[in-house]
Curated annotation (Swiss-Prot):
Functional note: Na(+)/H(+) antiporter that extrudes sodium in exchange for external protons.
GO cellular component: plasma membrane
Protein name: Na(+)/H(+) antiporter NhaB
Known catalytic reactions: 2 Na(+)(in) + 3 H(+)(out) = 2 Na(+)(out) + 3 H(+)(in)
InterPro entries (UniProt xref): Na+/H+_antiporter_NhaB
Coarse class of the protein's main subcellular location: membrane
Transmembrane intervals: 14-34, 63-83, 99-119, 122-142, 146-166, 206-226, 239-259, 307-327, 357-377, 451-471, 479-499
Taxonomic placement: Bacteria, Pseudomonadati, Pseudomonadota, Gammaproteobacteria, Enterobacterales
Length: 526
């Protein structure tokens, strides 16, 4: 090996342990992009870049998308597809999301003891898998109506890693918390391997139910998703009026989403329906008993402190007392101070999981900058705005859903609501039509986007988390498991936009539950 030529060594180092065919594919992408951009069409080069980036996300288990996606984004800036200034504009425009990832996810890490305590009790008390799935989906939906979906999914990931670690350490006979739970070589028997596979399938289904739950709840309120806030501000709605305007679509979708959760579990469809293995249940029960017996007064105080911080977290986020990232930072400060975590090394561990994804999301904003500079969505937006008022609602809903499933739904929602607001300000559509379009944009952005991990930041965070490889949750598997929800939520949402939105909005208006906001036909919509 010492005599290896330099070019071979470079190829071996390039993207590390990724397969050779994957390395060659990325190399071909980097070769083709400038040729297409300079000699064929910048527009189609932009679309090819979007497809390539989606490919890197799809191959996340072969190679973390930050490196190949980052190389593609860097090249896009170098050849002029976008500029560093535009990328920085996108990054600063989404600074709340980045701060959330840096501080909120780390804050949740310091509440792990309480979360594991609560969810272990929940898991061991509820024996019906359908009921447990319903509890996870419903709890995620409720929390996502008030908290950010990323925060909710970070909680569920933290709990799932805790459960997985407890059984893996038992099965591999590694007692300490420092044991490598990603290494299956130490599993002591074939029975443990089989049980672990079952447990992985069980955790996958719970996580997907929770992930979809964040979308079901997040679409309902103006604080549920970042783009909701942008849409609410543009339409002049407060918390209650936003909920009421959305309810003709979101309430039927929520009911059908919950029914889908029960049906896929009951009939064991699309990878759902796997029960918690008895061996794992016994290990978790033993762990729970052991922890209860060993719990010292200090441990009990830690749980109490974390519970109080949890209440602060929900209240602060629900009433938007500060930006999400700052609330996360306050959680870190209080949890570490009152639980006695003061060593730099111990605090640093909390940031390990979120930082790679934070970097990846920044790369994602570079791709969004290309979409803006090359105006990749402009033809679609122009086409929709030129159609008749009667067909605008369904077209806005469908095109929002399509674009949100391949791009950032915050970006798509922002672009569409700005275009709709401009059309209203220029007198092309009425105020009532603008409000209906705002509902179609919000629901279209949030509901069909569960189809792929690209559309929902919470799904992308789950896919690229340290948990995904542990439970064998790949891009393809996520798409398949999300499929029943995608079909039901998209179709029910579409039918509601088409048939119930207008009459129910009129009903709410006539009964003075909602009223037209005082929007002017001129000026910016800041």
């Amino acid at each position: 090996m010492t005599g290896m030529p330099l070019h071979r060594a470079l190829l071996k180092n390039f993207l590390g342990y990724a397969p050779d065919w994957y390395k060659l594919t990325i190399f071909c992408f980097l070769l083709v992009n400038p040729l297409l951009f300079y000699f064929v069409s910048p527009f189609w080069a932009g679309w090819l870049l979007v497809v390539e980036f989606i490919f890197t996300l799809g191959m996340a288990l072969k190679c973390y998308p930050l490196q190949p996606g980052g190389l593609l984004a860097l090249q896009a800036m170098l050849i002029g597809m976008t500029s560093p200034q535009q990328v920085w504009h996108e990054v600063t425009g989404n600074i709340e999301v980045l701060m959330l990832l840096v501080f909120m996810v780390a804050g949740i890490y310091f509440m792990k003891q309480l979360l594991l305590f609560v969810f272990t009790k929940l898991l061991l008390r509820i024996h019906s898998k359908a009921l447990l799935s319903l509890a996870f989906c419903g709890a995620a939906a409720f929390l996502s109506a008030f908290l950010d979906a990323l925060t909710v999914i970070a909680v569920v990931i933290s709990v799932a890693i805790g459960f997985y670690g407890i059984y893996h350490r038992f099965a591999s006979q590694q007692g300490g918390n420092e044991a490598d739970i990603s290494d299956d070589s130490a599993l002591s028997s074939e029975e443990h391997r089989h049980t672990l596979e079952q447990f992985r399938a069980f955790l996958r289904s719970l996580l997907m139910h929770a992930g979809v739950g964040t979308a079901l709840g997040g679409v309902m309120t103006m604080v549920g998703e970042p783009q909701n806030l942008i849409i609410a501000k543009s339409a002049g709605w407060d918390f209650v009026s936003f909920f009421l305007h959305m309810s003709p679509v979101t309430v039927p979708v929520f009911i059908c989403g919950i029914l889908t959760c029960v049906l896929v579990e009951r009939f064991k469809l699309f990878g759902y329906g796997v029960n918690l293995p008895d061996n794992v249940r016994r290990v978790l029960e033993d762990y729970d008993r052991d922890m209860t017996e060993k719990r010292t007064p200090q441990d009990k105080v830690r749980l109490l402190v974390q519970a109080v911080i949890g209440v602060w977290l929900i209240v602060a986020l629900a009433f938007h007392l500060a930006e999400v990232g700052l609330i996360g930072l306050s959680v870190i400060i209080m949890a570490t101070a009152f639980c006695g975590v003061t060593e730099e090394h111990a605090i640093g561990k909390a940031f390990q999981d979120a930082m790679p994804f934070t970097a990846l999301l920044t790369v994602f904003f570079a791709i969004v900058a290309v979409i803006i500079d090359q105006q990749l969505f402009s033809p679609i937006i122009r086409y929709v705005l030129q159609s008749s008022e009667s067909s605008q609602l369904t077209q806005f809903y469908l095109f929002n859903g399509l674009l949100s499933s391949i791009s950032d739904n915050v970006f798509v929602g922002s672009v569409y609501i700005n275009e709709a607001r401009s059309a209203f300000e220029n007198g092309h559509i009425s105020l009532s039509q603008f409000e209906l379009l705002a509902v179609a944009i919000n629901t279209g952005t949030n509901l069909p986007s569960v189809a792929t991990p690209n559309g929902q930041a919470a799904f992308l965070f789950l896919l690229t988390s340290s948990l995904a490889p542990l439970i064998r949750l790949s891009y393809g598997r996520m798409v398949i498991m999300a499929l029943p929800y995608t079909i039901v939520m998209t179709l029910v949402g579409l039918l509601c936009v088409e048939f119930t939105l207008v009459p129910f909005t009129d009903f709410l208006m006539n009964n003075h539950w909602i009223s037209l906001p005082n929007l002017t036909l001129s000026g910016s919509h800041s």
